[in-house]
Structures are given as structure tokens and as C-alpha cells.
Regions:
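AAA+ P-loop NTPase catalytic core and its hallmark functional loops
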Residues: 1-161, 165, 255-257
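Alpha-helical lid/collar subdomain of P-loop NTPases
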Residues: 140-257
Length: 257
């Protein structure tokens, strides 16, 4: 989502500003500004980059991970995003001036909406209604493989296909009647794996960093992690085969037989 949004911003060829709302711990400081006290000058107000952004004519402002933002950030954005209001009150400033959003300013936001996403909040419907919603489905195998080759041209087509196939298998598995895993490999993780492959790591090594930590190892040979090792094993070369411990090897042999 973020990558697509950034490509959109680049294509528009207009002044652009990026704000990761999911990462900020200080919504007021990020969107309005902060007051500072100096003995010589007294209390001063430093407006935020966001204030500059909304005053920039024809700017495109990307609000990334808005579904992870603090509710206070949503409250601040309500009037800014409302087509009938389009203003921001700097209530941290001693004079509390009102800043109007400049002509032609466009806001683009990204969000993960749904119970399967952790660390997100149920978004206020009034905030959601201020946007035109574009739903993005998961890439299919061919699309994901093509994306990996585009972003990391140093990997082989076979490597790109293998990573895309592993990701696709996890997405199908969690939708099955009796899924053996509780989450799937995202496109973001696929891209990270491809980056490691391009840097010279093999698939087994990349999986240790990018895949297995996201899958529970409780349950021994019946664990999610063992299942994922079995999936990855199918796409590892002979030099990468030793990815199981002794118990997992026995389980793998039983599965193969």
C-alpha cells in the first residue's frame, strides 16, 4: 500500500510530504507543533512540518498507516480533511491562529482495516468517509514474482518465483478449512526475502530471518514453524537442505513417505 501510494505521489509530479502516523508518539507535535521555553526568549512556538505542508499549494500529503495512529491524530485531522472546512487550528500557539489548507492540496492515506491486523484501531467512520476508498487485494503469484524482480533485479527468475510461491501457499493455507498456520507471508516480507537473496544469502538463510520468527514454534513437530520449514524446504537447493532439527527431520520423512 505504501509503495503504491508513493508511486502515485511521484507520478503526480507535485510537491509532496510524507508522514508516518503509525510511528508517531506525539500526534500534536507531529501535526501542529511544539512550544519551547528559553530563559532569554520565554515561551516560543515551533510549527510542525505538517503545517507547512498544508499551506503548500498543490501539495500531495501522504498519511501513512493512519489506522495505527493515535485517536488524537484523527481528531486533529477531522477539520483538515473535511471538504467544507479545510483548516487546522494551532491551539498550541499563544494566539491559536487558524491555518487554511492551501488550494489544490491532496491527501492520500494508507490503512490496514480488519480484525486480522494487530496494533491497528477501529477507525472512526467520520474519518473514513473523508476519503475515496481504494481496496487493494493481495498480489497473485505472477504479480508478486514480477514485483520482486523489478525491485531486486539481481535475483534470478527462479528465486523470484519460489518466494512468490511460498507466500502464495501461506495465503491459501490460512483460508483453508483447517489451517496449519495463523498468518500469511505479506508482500513486504517477500520483498525483504528477495533483498537478502540479492545480497547473496540463500533461501534457507533468508527464511531464518524473514519467515520463521513470525510462526509459533510451540507444538514441536506439529508447530507452525515446522510446517513453514517443510514449505520452504521444497524450494531449497541441495546445499540448503539442512534446515530441520532431528525431530523435524523425522517428521519430514514421515510426511514425504
Amino acid at each position: 500500500k505504501t509503495m503504491a501510494a508513493k508511486k502515485l505521489v511521484e507520478a503526480l509530479d507535485r510537491p509532496d510530504f510524507y508522514f508516518n502516523l503509525g510511528a508517531t508518539q506525539d500526534p500534536r507535535g507531529t501535526l501542529i507543533g511544539n512550544t519551547h521555553f528559553k530563559k532569554e526568549e520565554g515561551t516560543t512556538f515551533a510549527e510542525s512540518l505538517f503545517v507547512k505542508a498544508i499551506q503548500t499549494k498543490d501539495a500531495v500529503i501522504l498519511l501513512d498507516e493512519i489506522s495505527r495512529a493515535h485517536p488524537e491524530a484523527w481528531n486533529i485531522l477531522m477539520t483538515v480533511l473535511d471538504a467544507g472546512q479545510r483548516y487546522l487550528r494551532l491551539d498550541e500557539h499563544v494566539d491559536a491562529p487558524t491555518i487554511k489548507v492551501a488550494e489544490g492540496v491532496t491527501f492520500v492515506a494508507t490503512a490496514n482495516i480488519g480484525n486480522e491486523y494487530t496494533a491497528t484501531r477501529a477507525m472512526d467512520r467520520a474519518l473514513v468517509d473523508r476519503f475515496i476508498i481504494v481496496e487493494m487485494d493481495t498480489l497473485n503469484k505472477d504479480q508478486e514474482s514480477g514485483l520482486l524482480k523489478d525491485l531486486h533485479p539481481g535475483i534470478t527468475q527462479e528465486q523470484a518465483d519460489n518466494v512468490a510461491e511460498i507466500a502464495s501457499m501461506t495465503r491459501k493455507e490460512i483460508k483453508s478449512d483447517a489451517p496449519r498456520i495463523t498468518n500469511a507471508i505479506s508482500t513486504r516480507i517477500s520483498v525483504e526475502i528477495a533483498g537478502l537473496l540479492e545480497d547473496g544469502f540463500n533461501l534457507a538463510e533468508a527464511a531464518e530471518v524473514c519467515i520463521y520468527p513470525f510462526f509459533d514454534e510451540d507444538g514441536g513437530v506439529d508447530s507452525e514453524r515446522t510446517y513453514m520449514k517443510q514449505v520452504v524446504q521444497k524450494y531449497c537447493g541441495t546445499a540448503e537442505e539442512d534446515i530441520f532439527n532431528a525431530d523435524e527431520v523425522e517428521a519430514q520423512e514421515e510426511l514425504d513417505s
